């Protein structure tokens, strides 16, 4: 599955709850280390999730602080690395949609 096919769903989920595309992008940049320009290039290339995370310039070390349940599974217990990164991102977008402050979402 391509990251580009899921990205609009992340944005729609956030916007439906009064949040912005810019906040979604900020979360993705925080998690992966991509610049805005590099993020847009990945979207344009329709990169799959595995490549998207494998090519991430600097996966944020604080992502290990992300805890909780997504789709009935605890993100910290997921063993497959790519799936865990996807679920980390899902969890951050869920927190955004639930109205959490960006400072809390970004674990600062």
Q: In which residue ranges do the predicted regions lie?
A:
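A charge-rich, low-complexity, intrinsically flexible signal that marks solvent-exposed coils, linkers
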Residues: 1-108
């Amino acid at each position: 599955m391509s990251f580009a096919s899921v990205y609009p769903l992340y944005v729609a989920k956030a916007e439906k709850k009064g949040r912005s595309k810019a906040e979604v992008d900020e979360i993705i940049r925080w998690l992966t280390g991509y610049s805005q320009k590099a993020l847009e290039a990945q979207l344009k290339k329709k990169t799959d999730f595995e490549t998207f995370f494998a090519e991430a310039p600097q996966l944020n070390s604080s992502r290990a602080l992300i805890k909780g349940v997504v789709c009935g599974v605890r993100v910290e217990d997921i063993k497959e690395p790519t799936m865990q990164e996807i679920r980390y991102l899902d969890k951050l977008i869920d927190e955004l949609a639930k109205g959490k402050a960006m400072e809390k979402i970004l674990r600062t």
